[in-house]
Amino acid sequence: MNTIQVAGVETTPSKIVCVGRNYVAHIEELGNEVPEQMVVFGKPNSAIGNKLQAFHGGEPLHYEGEIALAISNGRATAAGFGLDLTKRTLQGQLKKKGLPWERAKAFDLSLIHI
């Protein structure tokens, strides 16, 4: 299992919960509609990494800076910064078919912590 440092303590996140489509300028840039409710998706522990890669499985990756919170017992215990990596071409193909786009967001090393 991958770990992160939270307040100097090595921690193994049990799950990673992400909120998508929360930045209007980026929503418009991608030609998406602003959702009425927040879009939530998950990433597995294997998504955590610390080396930025430009490609995954031959596909170029897009990145977005994200504010990250560590939550324990219902409380935010730390804040940090990370990069959310996306297989944008695959995501577009899945969205056109009305399929979940988890494969484009939740692959190994798709969440870079800094």
Protein language model features and the residues they cover:
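Catalytic-core "active-site belt" of small-molecule-metabolizing enzymes
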Residues: 1-113
